[in-house]
Structures are given as C-alpha cells and as structure tokens.
C-alpha cells in the first residue's frame, strides 16, 4: 500500500472560494449590478408579508408588466416630445470651426432640409424621421455658452488632434462642468484622415485620455471626415440617450426663435412680449411666472400654438389655438413682505436727530484744526464705528503692538503718535512703488497672512472701554453645545423675507406638482399632446429694454418658475474656491456675481464654515482648500442647483472665484463672528497667574469676568479678580502655565448678510472674461496652425 497522498493534477479546477462579501454589498452596488432589473425578492416581498404565495408564472408576469410599463413610458416621452433635438457645438483648441463642421454635416445626405433662425441652424432629416437644431455660441462669450448648454439636449465637443487645450479652453470647461452638462458627444475632425493606423490609435488614445481627465464621458470619440462618419454622427446625435439637466427636468423652458412686442394698454413704458419657440421640459403652466435672465420675473397671459417654421413634413397651415390661459390662481409678482412703519409702536426720530446721526465723526490727534481733520483718512475709525452697524465689517483695525514698559506709559497719546508715524511711512512707500501695483490687493494679502497666523485676534482698544467696543458680543461656554436663539435680535430686513415652516415638506409638495400633476390648475396647464410643439407665449408688462437687448444678442432662453421661487429669503450655498483665483477674497468688501441655476444676480455674501452643528463660524477670508457656505439675500431656489461665483476686477473683467451648489433656504442659519482678545502672563505662581494687556481698566475686567479663558496649549481658566486699576487681573487655570503661553478670551456675535441684491444684466454690464487682445492672438495662432 502506497504511503504517499493523492495530489491533484495541473488541470484540476480549484474549488470556488466562499464569497464573504456577497452579503455586504451596499444598496448602490446592488442597483448598479441589477442595471434597472427588478429582482424576484423585491417583487414578492409584499406578497410574502401578507402570507400570499406567488407562483413562478405570476412572478414572470410581473417582470414582463414592469418591462412593458417602462417601454410604454419611453414611447410616450418620445411621442409627446416632438421638438427638435437641440445640440450645442463647442470647438476646443485648434479644432474645426463649427460653421465649417455643419457645412460638411449638411452634405452627407441629399434629403436633409436645412433652415435657419436667428439663434439656430435646423436640419430636417427624413432618413431618420427626426429634426436636429444646432447652436453655435461664441466660446469667448461665457454667458452665451451657458445659455446654450442650459437649453440643449446634447453637447457636442470638437476636439483638436493634438489634444492640447489653451488656458481659456480649460477655464471654459471648468465653468461648463460646474454649471452642469447634458449628454456629451465627442467628435475629432481629421481623425479619419490619418492613414497610419498606429499614429491614428495614438491620437485617439491621447484625446480619450484628455476626456477622461476631465471626467466628462466614457463613450469614446467619433470621426467626422467621410460621408459615412457624418451619417453615423447624425444618427448618434438623434438616437443617443438624452440625460436632461435637473434644471430642464424641473422647469419648463423655451429657446426663443422669434420675439415680437406690442404696447401694453395699462402702461406706455411697458410692452407685451410674444415669444415664439418650442415648448420644452415639463408641461407648461400659464399660472406660473416666467424668468427673463437679467430682467426679472413676469406673468404669462396665455399660450397658443403657432406654425412650425422647421417642419419635417409639409402640411396645410392651421390657425392658432389657445392651449393654456392664466386665471385668478396665477402666481403673484410679490417678492418681499411690505413693512409697516408703525409696526412695533416705535417712536419715529425727529429731523434734528436724523441730521445729528448723519454727521461724520472723526477722532483726530490733539491740536488738529478742522481743515486738517477734513484730510485725515479715517478708515480704521470708520471701520470700528460701523462694525456694530454693519455686522460684516472686519475687527482687525487696531493691530498695533503695545510696548512692554510701565503701565502708566501706555497712554492713548503714544498710540496715536505711533499711528501718525505709520501713516507718514506709508506715504513715502506710495511714492516709491510702481504705479501698477494694486495697493488694495497688497493689503488683502497682508491681512490674510495675519489672519492665518493669529486667527480672529484683535487688540483691545486703549482709548475706549472694551465693554463698549464689544457690547454686541457675548461669551459661550462651548461653541458646539451652547444654545443661541435663532429668533433673537434679528435685523429689520428679516421682516421683509419669506420663510418656510417646513422646507422639506414644501419642496416635496412643489416637486410633486411638476409636469401637469396639479389637479387644481384647470385650463392653465397645457395638455401632454402639446408638449414640444411650436407655440407663442404672451408675457405681460415687460420693460422695453428686453426687446432692445434681444435685437443685439439674438439669444434668449425663458424658464418658468416653480411656486415660491420669486420670493426673497436667505439662500445658503456650498462653495469651493477655484484654484485659478489666487487673490485673497475678503468676506466683507467683495460684491460677487452669482449664477444660481438660470438666475444671475449681484450681492454681498457672508462666508461661514461648512461644518455640522447649529452654529457656524464666520470666515474672514475665503478658504482656499476647504468648502465654505455663502449666505445672501436672494430669491428662493430649491436644491439641488448649480452655483457659479464670479468677481469683477478693476478692469471690468469677470474672474471665476468659486463653484458649488445650493445648500438650502434657511434664515435660521446662525453665523457667528469670533473675536479673540489676548493677554500676556505677567506673573506665574503654579496655577495662579497675573495677566496684563488684555484689558486696561477695572470695569472691563469685572464685565468679562464670567467668560472662560484658555491658552493655545490647551489650558482652561477663569478671571478671579482685578489687581489695581490699570488692567492687571488675577486668573486661575486648571494646570500650570508656560511662560511662552498667551491667554485668550473668545467673544461671539451673530452676523447677517447685507440686503444689496440686484439683477446682473450682462447686456447692460458688458464684460469679457479675458482681454480681447488675448482672444485675438489665440485666434491668429489657431488660423496659422490650421493653415500649416
């Protein structure tokens, strides 16, 4: 008998390993693996819960019914949405011009009927029984590109063979990605003309690598050189699965192809617009308001059908038919609550008191005449006085270091003389530097660096009691757990805004009525069969400037508002600073240009930390690495919605500052501004410490006695009593202090945004995102490269 054991052969298949991870998949992984298929367990779960046995044939029938239901829904969407597929052509790098690309595309089939409108180039393709409308915006005009993308079903990129993008192309892609992209098709003109197969594959892989780097599409690239390539491209544009933007799925919209105006009977300065185009998106509701970018919200009187200018088949013309008409239930144009001047029974100030309050007060050195005082730049004093009126001002005006001599020598006169010497040196510095240096930006860099080294630290004023200077501040035992009443000491502007009792429930109710599901709308909602038809929308009481702007640009996209979206409230947006912006952005001195969904407006924002909790710390400067929340007065916008944040420089150009999305509409968000007062340990006796330079009189020490002290090394303590009359105080800590420690005291005050919301009309505020000379040089380089 052999003593050796059995050994499996080399062709023996090993046993299957135990899949321990199989039962630990997440719901997302299971959904991805199923790819839309409904499992038997999911279908029979309700049957098992009611103790009803389901046969195998019944389960198969349920799966078949689910498939048929999905196919019927898809056919219904295709049947009712008979508007032409809207495609935006965007050329990147040294690629083909969109006009030349469309000329070649139109010659691939003799049956294509090409028509033109002021904003589109339309193809009627009998071979595919479909229509395609092309938009060719100027890529140097960001507003035109964004408008085209918001209205498009497909975005077609024309990539260069070198796969190299200019700096402007990369910035444009960043802006477009942040604003949201529809279905993407990537085309490479000239790819089919490369005869060498290896070189052709290298070019293809290089372009696909660039596309994957931008995380835009994994469908590969398509050539567009031969007739076969162009036919295949048209088929792809027509039959590819369209993934609508959230903006398109929620809001009815129209790309205006014709605009006419008639005078309003009520007001001669107003007109009634007749906007013609295809009805896109969910079913239109004549009771909802409509938004004209840059001009505001307006009411619709009626919607009627019109003759299609780009028909697939010629048919006898039909008369106009009213398909929706506004009634008494239509949305109001009220944006804010009207304040009652007598509300609260507050006595109105007299004219003498108003004049006295308007007088400008300045602190000047002793002996200064009134004529000299008129020339003193009082930025620091004005900032200090206005800080209690405008809560978003900075607290770092007095950053002079106190001399560590006898206490009696630290007088306000010494500080003022020191400030005078600083002003003289600054004047000499101004004379010596180059005029091209922006002194305001240099000052921002300095303040940002100081804030990074000593966050929120402010020197206690010597010539003013600290209890007066920081009278609107309070101490907190714990920033995380201490309570703060959100309805306490609200500004007057809070009486003008709207607030939801339950934001989530209101949003759920509004979203449930999208697409003609509102049973109370009556004749104001169009029938599903009219979705996608060419129609005329009549808009009432529109300013004449809208017509003038359209004549210049020939570019207008209309969006219908959801209920409540015309009302003003507090809008919170989660943003992240863009790497291309290297300038320090202060939270109080910069007015931003926001692109929120289809809205464009200007406003000052309060920047705060994006952290969990019910209280959030004010960010004095826009963070570079982490996300933050910008809070502004703005119309209500239901999340999710994309946000682009720009700033306007001294030359009138717009620079991308940050990108993000809408967080919520919540006026109860508590943003606290922290001010840190610091002192120096004068004498240390184990846990007992005498601290100086935090306060300069006995009354201030008694006033801030309840506030807890701490040190950067983590020690905690309290003020025990004042020592003398010049600001020394005896403190006690939980452990012994180090001689290099500083003693800190935190004070907090709630801040609110400033009500300065205004519509941003790019037609009235012409600005380029880059200098025109640079754009022309790029165009010349492209033309030379194409000729070579």
UniProtKB/Swiss-Prot annotation:
Keywords: Nucleus, Ribosome biogenesis. One of its GO terms (biological process) is endonucleolytic cleavage of tricistronic rRNA transcript (SSU-rRNA, 5.8S rRNA, LSU-rRNA). InterPro entries: AARP2CN (IPR012948), Bms1/Tsr1 (IPR039761), BMS1_TSR1_C (IPR007034), G_Bms1/Tsr1_dom (IPR030387). GO terms for molecular function: GTP binding; GTPase activity; U3 snoRNA binding. Disulfide bonds: none annotated. Residues 1-40, 354-433 are annotated as: Disordered. Pfam families: AARP2CN, RIBIOP_C, Tsr1_G-like. This is Pre-rRNA-processing protein TSR1 homolog.
């Amino acid at each position: 008998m052999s003593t050796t054991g059995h050994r499996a052969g080399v062709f023996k298949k090993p046993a299957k390993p135990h899949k321990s991870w199989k039962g630990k998949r997440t719901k997302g992984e299971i959904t991805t693996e199923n790819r839309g298929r409904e499992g038997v367990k999911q279908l029979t779960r309700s049957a098992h819960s009611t103790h009803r046995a389901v046969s195998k044939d019944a389960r198969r029938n349920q799966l078949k019914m689910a498939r048929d239901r999905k196919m019927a829904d898809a056919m219904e969407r295709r049947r009712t949405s008979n508007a032409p597929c809207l495609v935006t052509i965007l050329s990147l790098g040294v690629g083909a011009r969109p006009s030349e690309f469309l000329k070649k595309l139109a010659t691939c089939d003799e049956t294509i009927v090409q028509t033109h409108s002021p904003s589109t180039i339309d193809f009627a393709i009998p071979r595919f029984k479909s229509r395609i409308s092309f938009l060719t915006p100027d890529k140097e005009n960001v507003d035109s590109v964004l408008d085209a993308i918001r209205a498009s079903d497909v975005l077609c990129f024309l990539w260069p063979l070198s796969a190299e993008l200019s700096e402007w192309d990369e910035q444009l892609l960043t802006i477009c990605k942040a604003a949201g992209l529809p279905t993407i098709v990537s085309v490479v003109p000239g790819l089919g003309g490369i005869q060498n197969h290896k070189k052709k594959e290298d070019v293809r892989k290089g372009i696909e690598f660039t596309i994957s780097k931008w995380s835009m599409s994994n469908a590969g690239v398509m050539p567009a050189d031969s007739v076969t390539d162009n036919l295949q491209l048209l088929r792809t544009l027509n039959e590819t699965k369209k993934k609508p933007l959230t903006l398109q799925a929620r809001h009815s919209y129209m790309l205006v192809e014709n605009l006419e105006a008639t005078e309003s009977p009520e007001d001669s300065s107003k007109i009634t617009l007749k906007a013609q185009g295809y009805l896109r998106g969910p079913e239109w509701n004549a009771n909802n308001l409509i938004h004209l970018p840059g001009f505001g919200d307006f009411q619709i009187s009626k919607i009627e059908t019109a003759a299609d200018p780009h028909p697939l088949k010629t048919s006898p013309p039909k008369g106009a038919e009213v398909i929706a008409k506004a009634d008494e239930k239509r949305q109001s144009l009220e944006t804010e609550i009207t304040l009652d001047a007598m509300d609260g029974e507050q006595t109105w100030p007299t004219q003498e008191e108003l004049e006295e309050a308007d007088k400008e007060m300045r602190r000047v050195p002793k002996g200064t005449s009134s004529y000299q005082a008129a020339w003193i730049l009082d930025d620091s004093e004005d900032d200090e006085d206005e800080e209690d009126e405008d809560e978003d001002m900075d607290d770092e005006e007095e950053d002079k270091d106190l001399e560590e001599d006898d206490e009696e020598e630290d007088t306000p006169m010494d500080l003022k003389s020191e400030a005078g010497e600083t002003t003289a040196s600054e004047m000499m510095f101004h004379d010596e530097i180059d005029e091209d240096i922006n002194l305001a930006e240099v000052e921002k860099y300095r303040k940002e660096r100081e804030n990074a080294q000593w966050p929120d630290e402010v020197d206690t004023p010597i010539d003013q009691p600290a209890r007066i200077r920081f009278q609107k501040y309070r101490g907190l035992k714990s920033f995380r757990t201490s309570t703060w009443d959100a309805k306490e000491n609200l500004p007057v502007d809070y009486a003008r805004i709207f607030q939801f009792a339950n934001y989530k429930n209101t949003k759920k109710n509004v979203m449930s009525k999208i697409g003609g599901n509102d049973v109370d709308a009556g004749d104001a909602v169009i029938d599903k069969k009219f979705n996608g038809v060419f129609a005329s929308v009549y808009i009432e009481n529109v300013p004449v400037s809208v017509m003038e702007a359209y004549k210049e640009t020939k570019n207008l996209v209309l969006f219908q508002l959801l209920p409540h979206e015309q009302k003003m409230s507090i809008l919170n947006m989660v943003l992240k600073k863009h790497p291309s912006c290297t300038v320090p952005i202060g939270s109080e001195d910069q007015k931003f240009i926001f692109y929120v969904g289809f809205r464009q407006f200007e406003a000052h924002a309060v920047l705060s930390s994006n952290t969990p909790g019910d209280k959030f710390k004010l960010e004095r400067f826009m963070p570079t690495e982490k996300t933050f929340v910008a809070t502004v007065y703005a119309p209500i916008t239901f999340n999710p919605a994309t946000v682009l944040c720009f700033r306007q420089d001294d030359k009138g150009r717009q620079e991308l500052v940050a990108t993000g999305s809408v967080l919520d509409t919540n006026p109860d968000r508590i943003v606290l501004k922290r001010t840190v007062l610091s002192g120096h340990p004068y004498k240390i006796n184990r846990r007992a410490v005498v601290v100086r330079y935090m306060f300069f009189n006995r009354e201030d020490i008694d006033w801030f006695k309840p506030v807890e002290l701490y040190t950067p090394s983590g020690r905690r303590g309290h003020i025990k009593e004042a020592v003398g009359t010049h600001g020394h105080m005896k403190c006690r800590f939980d452990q012994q202090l180090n001689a290099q420690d500083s003693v800190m005291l935190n004070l907090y005050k709630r801040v609110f945004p400033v009500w300065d919301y205004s519509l941003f009309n790019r037609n009235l505020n012409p600005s380029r995102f880059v200098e025109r000379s640079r754009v022309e040089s790029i165009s010349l380089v492209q033309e030379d490269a194409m000729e070579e």
